[in-house]
Each structure stands twice: as structure tokens, then as C-alpha cells.
Amino acid sequence: MRPSTVTSRIWWSESSSSSSHDLSGSWEHTSLQRTSDHFSSMGSIDSLDHSSQLYPSGHLSSAKSNSSIDHLGGHSKRDSAYGSFSTCSSTPDHTLPKADASSTENILYKVGLWEASRPGSSRQSQSTGDPQGLQDRPSSFLPRVPGNSSKSPRPEDNIEPKIATSGRSNFGPVWYVPDKKKAPSPPPLGLPLRSDSFAVAARGHEKARGPPFSDLASMQHFTTLPHVQPRGDRRMETTDRQWKLAHPSSGKEIGNVGYQPEGHLDCRWLCSDDRAGRPSGAPGRHQFSLSSTDVHFLKSYHGSQHPQPCSDESPRFPSSPRELLRITPSGCLQEPPELSQDDNPAQVRWPGSVNQKLDDRGRSHYFSVPHRQPVHGSAHVLIPRSDYWHSDTTPVDLECPLLRPDQRGYPQQYEETPASHERGGYQQLNAGIEGCCSGIHEPPRASHTVRAGLQCPGNDFKLVDAESGRISRQRTPMLHSLTQDGAWRPGNSKDCGNEKPPLLDAQVGKPTRRSDRFATTLRNEIQMRRAKLQKSKSTVTLAGDSEAEDCAGDWRVDVGAVPEGSFPSTYKEHLKEAQTRVLKATSFQRRDLDPTPADQYPGPPEHRTCDHSASSSLSSFPGEPDSAPRLCEAGLAKPPSSAGGVPHILRIGGRKRFTAEQKLKSYSEPEKINEVGLSGDHSPHPTIRTSEDSVGTFADRWKFFEETSKSLLQKPGHRQAFCGIPREKAERPQTQGHECESTEPWFQKRSRATSCGEILSEDRKVEKASEKLNPPRRLGTFAEYQASWKEQKKSLEARSSGRYHSADDILDAGLDQQQRPQYIHERSRSSPSTDHYSQEVPVEPNRQAEDSGGQKEALLCTLQAEEGCSAPSSSVLSSAQPQDSQHVNEDPTSPQPEAQLSSKCQHLQTSTMETSRSPSPQFAPQKLTDKPPLLIHEDNSARYCPVTACYVFIPCRLQVFVAGALPQLQTLGIERVMDNNTTVKMVPIKIVHSESQPEKESRQSLACPAELPALPSGLEKDQIKTLSTSEQCYSRFCVYTRQEVETPHRARPPEPQPPSTPAPPVRDSCSSPPSLNYGKAKEKTVDDLKSEELAREIVGKDKSLADILDPSVKIKTTMDLMEGIFPKDEYLLEEAQQRRKLLPKVPSPRVTEDNSCPSLSAICYNLGTRSKSVPVSQLIKIKILASSPRKQDPGMPGVVSLATNSTYYSTSAPKAELLIKMKDLQEPEEYSAGDLDHDLSIKKQELIDSISRKLQVLREARESLLEDIQANNALGDEVEAIVKDVCKPNEFDKFRMFIGDLDKVVNLLLSLSGRLARVENALNNLDDSPSPGDRQSLLEKQRVLTQQHEDAKELKENLDRRERIVFDILATYLSEENLADYEHFVKMKSALIIEQRELEDKIHLGEEQLKCLFDSLQPERSK
């Protein structure tokens, strides 16, 4: 374990693994065992670390970071920064005597001892970013660690090891702060300062490569020599004891002292007290109260000698304003993150050590043993007296570089990778901006003023001199806290040496008390803010590479490169530039949200508080996507100068409340939520600097993001990011870690994490206009999207931000690709994942974007669903739908822009939507759909119709497309009557178009083979699943719906009849609309009425035929009893489609008769031949000689002798033709001298002929049905072979048993139904005085059969359950095509069995009717 891990062990034993959100839970003070007493460099200084809890909730706290030790121990480059930070012990010294506070001189003395005792070479630290240097340095004092600390009476002997190994990081350098009575000019030797934090530090930077640390050591001696003797012995003992406590495995663990756990601040300025060998009881130790929230200030040099111990509970007041500087949210002094790196050149600096080398500084921080666990995160402020500083370095800025814990509470260095280390500890010489700009991310309670106070001054170090007009208590309360009393002016520095400015916390309304633990406060507040942020629609802007490069260059000010004299100006320049950039890029300022115009930052941009940048939103760190913006957005998002007058007037939760109007807008127009509050004329763009060091445009930030981020899909858990931004925007370069960070300076990180910034908001306005010109393209993969950004270096005005896209927008995106739009993953307002539903199918450029998704899809579905109904492609819609024809009948090669289609989609979406038809699928506009299950066909034949809620897609097997009748469309009440001229007539219910042979041929010729694959040979097997006529099956426009989609309507679709052949009489009756049960008519056609009339005439003359021909006779059939068990219509209709093509017969004039409608429109319902060539007049002329109402489906032959009626053979085209001929032949006789008997015989003969004809048709149908059964069995054999190959034996057995049982159960049900129907018919036809025995026997049979029938139904239910199980099994093994074959086979098997049974019954009944008629004619003939 490296020393850093040892150092933190005292805390880490319990908290290292604790949640990053539980910032204070595991910091047990009791377990620390007075470690703070032993390890604290200044007694209560330990408590200075307590504000580590200021880390945003998402970030690991310094104490609790799981990776802080282990990861740091792993030579993480970020670790080095920890070493440089001397995070004061977070453990409060509850037991330390108040008199034990160490004074500044003691600390300095100790530092001197450390430095003097160490050879300068050993202090040589590796250049920044060199993790190995970290190891080397700790190893340099490993030998000393052992136990000499306890043996040697002289502090010099073992101070080193103790210092190096002390579990307590010392709280920054405590400089010799002379009393104001002392000479104002301090000794030439500079105080140890954070290189980037203070002007002196900056001077040190200028001479970063200066003298070896030995010089520094000597300087330190010089400062502290007077106190060496008195403190040495006691200090040695305590440090030894501390060493043992903190470093049980002293020797090898020391090496990691430099490695600080994440989240610890680099207190390089301060050398450890403990290590200095100061006696543990030294008064300086209790300089500070243990209160976690206390802001402690080092007393002046003299004051510290006679410390005034403060009670833990009493508020602390800084000895001098300068002490404010030391406030750090994590309880440690935080220097700008970049600076805080272990190897940072600007580590421990003394103003006088101009020649000090980067290495030396790197070593010096080792003596500031980082404490990973600032316990309470109290914000302690240690600010050296300004008079100590050389006059040329204005200490005014000391505050600026103050701790800028990185968004997570770590110094930013932790966000910055070694690359940032390479930039030098002074990577941002004005990291003070970071420190100040980042503001202290402390719990707002205790540190509101701290945040303000830590903000950098403006142009020069004199906050008040030049900018006093701009910094006021009312307008800039935070800055005001820093500037009050002129404490920061060099001229005033002497006077305020012993002066105690009011406690920072007091400015927020109450003194900080010990009970106000930052840990608890911060944790609670972070959680609260985090919850708020998650609800907010904040967006995060991403810093671009260009700014990263520009700014990195600006900030890479080498420590040794800056001449000593030029430092102040350089530092000020950087401050101004950085402040301006950060404020412009990340400002939360929104004019509508600012209470007064004063919030507009009237002053120069440099006076805009740097805290604002910090508040903009902490950049999300890899692996912690959410944490970044939480604290900053919620709590620190307030521009420091946000007018309001008093410090406590801050935005609640870090943001101001929307007005009712703004809320209304945000709710009613969610996509514009980021514009809420922005005045239309307010545009932040002009404020964006285009200079080389400017933050850069959003385009640059996007570019940076794209180059540094990885695929969005790699971290799906982070995809939600912030609600208000597209995932790609919210997504951080999470997996890039340090790479990404090293390439961008801190302010870019901030701008990258800015939430709801003005720039983003304004850009979105601009984007909305630009999006109209450049509709965003959808990209299938993030990789494409990422690559596309590199193509799109667009200006801000042309750039398209990823605004919310509604579902319509998602559908719209990506079709207009002739322009070069921004690539955007559109995000559905309601669903974060809708954009991933889109099929990654390239869209041809000529396909135009459509305006509305649902309407377009409905249109497309309609267009394609009507393909089957459309006549030849040149067909034109009837005048009833002129506008439909406009955009439906488009040439496939030059489709009309979809924009036009979309303009008319709306009216198509209603019932009329079905009327719009395109001649063939290739004419239907293609469009990506957002439904994953769709099969997108190259000719766009696949479409999901939202209106009908069914998929219309090219089946794997059939490759046929939609025929006019989508099952649900019948509810639209739209029906088409297609004649050869493709005229359209609107009639209720469903469209089933039976084309004539020429139509079929012409349409097939129109179907381009290239676009529609030829129908497979097994088409007939699949036709059962189509919803249209047989011609439609042939025409490849049939709907081949999945079972699950189709089941609700499979019973509905009408069954077509072959136009060229007389439909079987069985089917004729079924040619009624789907709503009619097979064999039953709800309405009587003209032919039915005439048939009934003829039957009545025959029955009236021959009572013996009444039972057979009387329309009023009600008989039950097998199919009646089977109803509800198997969807009879579904299977029969499908089977009829199968059969129909196998029955090519005489192409006689096809007369359509429909049971549902006595008008020509009824033709549309006819599943039989719909020859539109037969005029209505001819239908009217038809005289049906033998027909009875179709209400009776003769089902049971022999139940009642000849007890069936002619409606059993619902009139078909052949029958109509026969009747017409018979009528023509018989008319003369009918109207001749009325021989009734002769006329009756003629009528009977006509009926016999008709029945004979129908029987012939039925027999032919039976033959075709047998062929269908054979074909289906062959299909079943194929499926069984496939299943046997792919399935497990037991699964195959289930399949085979199910198929066998299916056959048995269907036959059983049919048999029982037939028997039960016969019994019931017999009971109904009993004479008025039947013998009791006959009725009793029939009733008993009825009871038994009824019970058996119920049992058979239960078997069927069980069979259905097994069918689902088998289907689930096969679905895992079979391809979609094979699975469709299986479904088809199963459905057809039962359907064909039932159909076969029904045909047999009908044939049997027809034969009985013929027999009866012949018998009735014999007596007459005999006469």
C-alpha cells in the first residue's frame, strides 16, 4: 500500500467503500483516536478538511472515494495531485487542548526543518504528469520512516518521516504573517504559496525551474528558526506517535504520501505541522475550532504565539481577511485543480524561492500529507497576511486561486489527466480563476459567502481599487465579502494583519456552528439539489476541441516561463480572459429570470464572478455522469452578481423560479423549455469571443465532444443524462477519462456542463429556424452520428441543436438528405428509446421528409393496403377522391414530395384514408417507421398502419402485399366496388375485390419483378392467411398477417370466389360480408327473395316437400354447433380461397348475389365471382325457381327426411345462370293456360336442375379441398421434418402429439356436433303425439351428447393451450418463414377438416333434396 493509502487509512477503514453520496456517514470521529491530535498540522486545522463533503453528490468525496486510495495507489496520474494537496486532517480534534494550537511560526519552523533535513535532490519531483515521480519521491524518504522519530530527541532527526507519513495532510503553508505592527515589507523570502493561487505563487511559477528545494528549505528555516528549539522535542514525540497511528505499516506505505485520494485538495502551500516537529501541545494546534463548518483563520505571526483558543461551538473569525483564502469546500485548501497535481510545478512555493524547481515543488507537497478524509468538510480559511507578500505581488488575488475544488470537490487536477499535469501546476496560471470561478462548492449554508469570497477579482488584484464600483454588497454580495474593509488591497494589508473580518458564514445570516457539519449539510443539500436537477430540463453544453486547444495553450503558462516582474499583469490578464470566457460560455444568466437589470453584469466581463463559471455546472466526470451538474446547477448556479442586494438572496436550489407564464410555456411547449425566460432579442452569441482563447463556438464544442466521446450505446445507463438534452449531448466522454480531460481546460469542462445556459437556449432558437432548412438526419448508430459531426463544422447559426423531437419529428427525420442536415438522434418527448426503434435502413435522397408520423404511416398503410384493391397501375380513383388520386398515383421514379402527401394525410387518416390507393406497392412512398418489428422492404412494401394496428408487411413466405381488405379497415365503413374500370363505390363494411382475369393479368404485368419477388410455389398454402380474393392471392397483394395480428379479424375477411368459375353453392351463401356467419344471411338478396317465393309456391302445392323446401323450417347443423369452438368463418373463408383457385370453371356471365345488400354495391361483399358485367336488370330478371331462405344451413343430412331447404345451396353464379336459362325456357309455359300441375312440375324440374348443378359444384369443391388437404399435409410433413431437426426430442414429441391430437379433437367435435344437431332436429320435428319412449330416448341422447360435446370443448381448450406451448418452443428454433409455415399448417389443418365435413354434409343434403324432388315428380309423370 502506498503512503497515500496509509495516510487515509484512519478514515478509510470504514468509509473507503462507502457510497459517494453518503458524504459524511462513515466519518467516525471516535474511530480516529485522536489521530487529528497526532496528525493535525495545526490542531484544529484538521477540521479544515471537513468541507470535503462539498463534492457534488455524484462525485466521490475526498474521504469516501472508493478509488481514492486504491486507485491513487495505482499510480493514477490524478493521484499525484492528491499528494500535492495537503488536505488537512478531516478528523476534528475533539480532545486536543485549546492551548495546543500551532502558530504560523511553528508550521513554518517545521517546514524549514523538513526542507533542511532533506537533500534538495531527494525533493526533486518528476515533471507533472509523471506518475513514477510520485513513487520516487515517497521512496526517497522511505528509509527515514521507520522509528527514528521516536528515538531522536531532535526534531530534525525524524521530522521528515513523520511529516511525510503523517496521516494528516497539513493545511497549506501557513505563512509568516507579521503583525500589522511589524514592518510592512516581509522578508525577501516568499511564503509557501499555492503556485497558482496567489500572486506570489505565480511569481514562484515564473521561476518554477528555480533553485533546488534546498533553497526553499533554507528560506523556510529562515522564517521559522526562532521557534525551532522550543518545539523540537515535543514535536518529535507527537509526530512519531502520529506516524505510528497513521501508518501502521510505516515503511512501505510512505511511498504513497504524495498520492492523495480523489477529492483531496492539494495543500501544497502548507507543510505539515506535525511533520515540522512542532510539539503536539503547541498552542498553534488549537488555533482553529473543530467545528466542521467553522471558518478558521490563522492568526498573525505574533497572534499565533499567543493564540486565543476558540471554542468549538463559537463562530470563528479570520485573523485577517487573507485567511479567507484558505477556505476549501473539501476542508483543504484547494488550488486550481490543474495546479494541485502532485507534479505541478506550483506546488509548495515560497515567494522568495524564485529558483525553486518544479521538482522541488513537487517534493515539497509530499510533506503535506494529504488527508483523504476531511471529516466535516468545514470550510476553514487560512489566508496569509497580505503584508507578508512582496509589495510587487498584490495579495488581492490570493483569494482568487483559492480552492477550486473540481466539480466533484476534487481539485480540477483530478479531472485533468496527466496531460493537464504536463501543462504544469500552473497550467492555468490564473487557475485562481478556477479556484474563484469554480467557486467553492460548499454547502450553500456555510459557504455562500465563501463562494463569493473565493471568486477572483477582476482586472487586477485590487478588487476594490478599480472595480469597487462594480462590486457591492447589494449586487455582488460574494465578491463584496472579499473586498470589504479593503482587506485585499496591498495597501491595507498591513492594517488588517490582526483584524478579524466577520465570519464568512455570518454573512449568510448566522455564524457557523460546530453543529452545522458540512458533511450532513452538504450531503442533504446535494441530495436535494440532485433531485431537483433530475427534474429540471437542464441542458449541458459541451466544450469544443478548438477551445480546448486554444485555452490549453493559454493556460499552459510554464512556471519558469513567466518573468518575476511580469507575473501580476500576466495573472490578471488570464483572470480577465478566463472569467470572460467562462461567464460568456457558461453563464446561467437569463434575462427573464434575473430580477433586475443589475444582473446583466453591466461591468466588464472580467468582473463577473468566476464563481459563476463554477456554478455553471460541474463537468460530468467519466463514470459520474450525473454528479457534475448537480451541485453547481442547483446550488451554485447563481451568478455572483445576480442582483438582489443581500447575500442570502440566492436562487432557491440554485435557480430562480419560473413565473406562471413561463411554467405554462414550459408545460405547453416542452420542446421550448430551454427558451423559457429568454427575451427574443437577447442573444448570447455576440458575447462569444472569437479570439484564439475564446471558449469557442458550440460547433467546436460539439466537435470536441465527438472526438473525445465514445459510443453512446456503450453506457446505456447514462443515456438519460439530462432530460432537456438529446442523449448525445448529455452523454459525456465517460469512457475517455483522462484523455478527454487532458485535452480541455477547466473552463471548457464547465461550459461543457453548463446547464440551461443562455447560449444553448439561444442556439436552440436559431436551430429551430435552421432545422426547417436542414432537417436533422437520423443515424442508425452512434458511430455514424459521431463520425458525422466531423463533417459538420457549421456556424452557430446554422447549427442544429438536439432539441426535443416529438414522435412526429422522429418520423420526419432523415428523409431529406439532399441537404446536409445536422445528424441528430431525435429523442421522443415521451420515450427515450423511440429513436432506436427506427430501422437502420438507408433512405434514398429523393424521399422527402414528411410532416406527421402517424398520418404518414396511416397513409402509407392505406396506400399499400389498397394495392390489392387497385386495378391496373394506371387506374385512377373515382371522382369521389380527387385529392387522393393526386398524391397516390405518383410515378415511382419521381414521387411527389412527401411534404405534399403529408399536407393531405390528415384527411386520409379518417375513414376516407382507405380511399387513397396507389396502383402498386412501388408507388407507395417509402418511409422509415419507428416500429422495430417491421419488415422494411426495398420497395417500401412493409408498413405498420397505426390506424388499423396491424402490420402490413411482405411475408417471409409470400412476398405478397396488402390486398384491399385489412381486417380492421372494415370498421371504417369503407367498401370498394371494383369493376373492370376500377371505379370505386363507397359502401359499408369491407372491401374484397375480385378481379376479372384481364384485371389480374394486367395487374400482375404491372408488378415489377424487380420490386416484388415472384410468389413462391407454396403460395397456395399461405393463401389461407390472406384476407382477399383468390385473384389477390395471385396478384401478390394479399395481406399475409401474422397469426397474432390476424386472429381478431381472420373471421372477418370475406372470402372471394373465383371469378372464372361458378363458386360452390356452399361458398355462395358465404359470400356475404364477414360479419355474416357462413351459410347464414342477415339480409336477403333479390335472388333469395325469388327463391323463397318459388319454394313457397312448390310447398304450397306439394306439402310433402314442405320439410325440405319450407324457408321457415329451422334446423340445426353441425356447423351451428361448431360455432364458437373454431372460428368457422375464418377457416372456411380461408379454405375457400385455397379451393377457389383450384376450381377454374366455365367463365359464364358471373352474376353477383350478395346476401347483405340487394343493390349492386352488395357485389363487393361477394366472395364469389363478381362479374361487374352483369347488369342489375339481368339480376332482377333472374327467376329463382327453387330456393328457400338461406337462414337454414342444411347441416344434418338424414335428421329429418328431406328436411332441408334450398337455401342450403345459396345461389351462386352458376345457379343464377341456370335459373336465367330455365326462366327463359319456362316463361312461355308459365304464362300459358295455367296447368298448375304442369307448372309445379316445371318448377320442380328447375329446382332439380339447380340443385344438381350445385351438387356438381360442391363435388368439384370437395375435390379441390382434398387437394388442399394434401398440400397442407405435405407442408405439415416439411414442418415436422424441420422441427425434428432443430428441436429436442421431447419438444418434437410435444409437437407431434399436438398435431395428432388436433386432428382427433377436431373430428371428435365435428362428430359430436353432427350427432347432437340430428338429435335436436329430431326432437324439433316430433309429431304432436309422439310416443313417450321416442321422445324420452331422444332427450336422453341429447343429454349425453351435450355432455360429451362440453367435454370435447374442454379438450379443445386444452389443445389451444398446448398449441401456444408448442408455438413458443418452435419460435425459438424456427425461422420466421418456417414458423409462418407451421402456423399456416396448424390453422389450415383444422379449417380443412371442418370444411371437408361441411361439404360432405351439404352434398349429402343436396342429394336428399334431389331424391325428394324426383320422387315427387314420379307420381305426376305417372299421371
UniProtKB/Swiss-Prot annotation:
Annotated stretches, region: Disordered: 1-101, 116-171, 300-357, 586-630, 758-855, 872-930, 1045-1085
Modified residues (Phosphothreonine): T834
Organism whose genome encodes this protein: Rattus norvegicus (Rat)
Skewed-composition ranges (Low complexity): 8-27, 872-885
Composition skew (Pro residues), residue ranges: 1054-1065
Bias type Polar residues, positions: 28-69, 83-93, 119-130, 891-923
Name of this chain's protein: Protein Shroom2
Residue(s) carrying Phosphoserine: S103, S185, S197, S291, S806, S830, S831, S833, S918, S920, S1072, S1329
Subcellular location: Apical cell membrane; Cell junction, Tight junction; Cytoplasm, Cytoskeleton
Residues passing through the membrane, by range: none
Domain notes: The ASD1 domain mediates F-actin binding.
InterPro entries: ASD1_dom, ASD2_dom, Shroom_fam
Biased composition (Basic and acidic residues): 761-771
Family statement drawn from the similarity comment of this UniProt entry: Belongs to the shroom family.
